[in-house]
Curated annotation (Swiss-Prot):
A Pfam family hit: Ribosomal_S8e
UniProt organism field: Oryctolagus cuniculus
An individual GO BP term: translation
Residue numbers of Phosphothreonine PTMs: 130
Family statement: Belongs to the eukaryotic ribosomal protein eS8 family.
Start-end of Basic residues biased regions: 8-26
The keyword Secreted is annotated on this UniProt entry: no
Role this protein plays: Component of the small ribosomal subunit. The ribosome is a large ribonucleoprotein complex responsible for the synthesis of proteins in the cell. Part of the small subunit (SSU) processome, first precursor of the small eukaryotic ribosomal subunit. During the assembly of the SSU processome in the nucleolus, many ribosome biogenesis factors, an RNA chaperone and ribosomal proteins associate with the nascent pre-rRNA and work in concert to generate RNA folding, modifications, rearrangements and cleavage as well as targeted degradation of pre-ribosomal RNA by the RNA exosome.
The UniProt record lists the keyword Cytoplasm: yes
Primary location recorded for the protein, binned into one broad class: cytoplasm
Protein name: Small ribosomal subunit protein eS8
Length: 208
């Protein structure tokens, strides 16, 4: 039997059975879930109604994630799935779906922040810098350009929770696209109240 999205196979509200008065139709069909995993990119195309195409991501390892408060979007590596409101099984099997909470690599965001504000981010006290990083952070600049950076530094404060994550090199993010439909795992970095909420949830789950 094929997967069907009809409702005439269900009983009536009164509990009586329904007689099927037509066969299954093409427009009622359902397909098996993609169950996208973390791994080297593998995407299948599916021909769908109206001559359109869907992109069924079976494995993905990178995505485009946006850091909302800094208006910075970068392509970065997806490391792990840590929370899913709908189903713990999807966390255990590391399945990428819309609205699941994942850990992503923070390096692209740190590099952008350091070059934009000329301030170190998520570095341990007294840690040695490589010559390139030294060049970015402690470069000699003309007065005009230095003034521009000083103006930027006034708004360079980020929350302590995010700073902790940058020190570990991983950020919590939420997937906003549908990997099994569009073949991509894009989303946004968690911040503020939303980040606090999910940190509590993850902690509670670990405590069980």
């Amino acid at each position: 039997m094929g997967i069907s999205r009809d409702n005439w196979h269900k009983r009536r509200k009164t509990g009586g059975k329904r007689k099927p008065y037509h066969k299954k139709r093409k427009y009622e069909l359902g397909r098996p879930a993609a169950n996208t995993k973390i791994g080297p990119r593998r995407i299948h195309t599916v021909g769908v109604r109206g001559g359109n195409k869907k992109y069924r991501a079976l494995r993905l390892d990178v995505g485009n994630f946006s850091w909302g408060s800094e208006c910075c979007t970068r392509k970065t590596r997806i490391i792990d799935v840590v929370y899913n409101a709908s189903n713990n099984e999807l966390v255990r099997t590391k399945t990428l779906v819309k609205n699941c909470i994942v850990l992503i690599d923070s390096t692209p965001y740190r590099q952008w922040y350091e070059s934009h504000y000329a301030l170190p981010l998520g570095r341990k006290k007294g840690a040695k810098l490589t010559p390139e990083e030294e060049e970015i952070l402690n470069k000699k600049r003309s007065k005009k350009i230095q003034k521009k950076y000083d103006e930027r530094k006034k708004n360079a404060k980020i929350s302590s929770l995010l700073e902790e994550q940058f020190q570990q090199g991983k950020l919590l993010a939420c997937i906003a696209s549908r990997p099994g439909q569009c073949g991509r795992a894009d989303g946004y970095v968690l911040e503020g109240k939303e980040l606090e909420f999910y940190l509590r949830k993850i902690k509670a789950r670990k405590g069980k």
